[in-house]
Amino acid sequence: MRLKLFAAAAALACLAAPTIAMSKPLTVCTESSPDGFDVVQFNSLVTTNASADVIFNTLVSYDEAAKKVVPSLADKWDVSSDGLTYTFHLRPNVQFQTTDYFKPSHSLDADDVVFTFERMLSDSNPWHKVAGASGFPHAQSMGLVKLIKAVSKVDDHTVKFELNEPNATFVPILTMGFASIYSSEYADKLLKANQQTDLNSKPIGTGPFMLKSYTKDSVIRYDVNPAYWGPKPKIDRLIYAITPDASVRAQKIKAGECQIALSPKPQDVLDAKKDKSLKVSEAPAFMTAFVALNTQKKPLDNPKVRQAINMAFDRTTYMKTVFDNTGTPAVNPYPPNTWSYDRNIAAYKYSSADAKKLLADAGFPNGFDTTIWVRPNGSVLNPNPKAGAELLQADLAKIGVKAQVKVIEWGELIKEAKQGQHDMLFMGWAGDNGDPDNYMSPLFSCNAVKSGINFARYCDSRLDKLIADGKSTADVAQRTKAYVDAQKIIHDQALWIPLVYPTAAALTRANVGGYSVSPFGRVNFGAVSVQ
């Protein structure tokens, strides 16, 4: 009997073993289609999630738990005593992905890093104009062209960056998605074949997943990269099910059609907490939701008009209606858990009467006509876009301002807003590394007006100098003073209507392990498993 039982147990074990060892696909319900996969051209979080977060790697990355920059493709780096030279030592034997459209002949080397940055920095580089009208928004807004004097190859596995001036934010900047490292060999192949646009549709990186197929507004399929240099993913395939409606994303995860649902509505989060088949991952987000007021459009060029608009908007009702009172009311450009946040600044007090009086003082006693731009579908930074826009529209009507709500598809909205076509724009920003400059340079510098992501389109020499001063030294006290003074200008000029510091959340099936929502809106599926 003992032998029979043992044999039966062994047989069962053999039958069960493949099931235990076998990895499974992971389907993620995402909110919209990426702009493409050539991440340096774009600044949307959706595009970063679909490209930089899964296909590529950067020289260094940001450890969210430890709150510090850590090695990635570079396993170490040195900084000269004057803060002007950074030398990165590349990890050996890192392979670029092998696909049916490219087979690399060598591993990652210094030429790849030099190509990646020269493409963005040098207008004589043949790849510089490939980005077209979109340019390189992050590189431009962060001022890298002015900051970086030269990028050069020391040897096959060593790269040197020479700066024109010390910059405390340089290494953190390299954690951002736009700093993903590209294959120079693949770029040369495409250039010779006159197929440069393939870089945006057929990406090659060093990351854990590689693109298999993409159907716009429907699905992105990734295979696991078998040559990945880091820990191998615990899933065998990754699928992005593009699902713009947050309510539909919630329905899909309840039905088991996806294992992770990103950017749920606050009410869906509350419902999921009561559902034993689901889990909720939450974190205070390093994000800010806001309405940008285009200072290059009349009468929004008048600071009194912008202040009146701030006074006219009932943000308490907005918080309740759009965010179900989750998150924290916003006052300054970045969240209060950020060092240098100025707690002495108070939000504009809601008062239609005071707003109307100030508008009259500005020369508009009968109001004016304007537009409010908003995306059609919800996200963590705007769960119910149209409802929020209609609340602002109704409040502005009380002071005589006639605002037309324009619901514009996300890709078109970003494109036209970067050209400054909007009046008032519901927008949001997710930081990448916890540094205040991650908001200040891309959203308020003069460089960012040129790149298009300073949506207030405000260029002021005083503010620009404070932003520059804030990153020219590593002294936290000096940086804090610069950023506090900058926040006062931003508030007094009423460049935004600050809305909410949201809570980042994601829903997962109960059988999913290893996934944590990022406060920065990034995604990491490398450690995720599906039981």
For the regions a language model picked out, list residue spans one by one.
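A structural "hinge/loop" feature
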Residues: 33-49, 73-74, 100-104, 168-180, ...
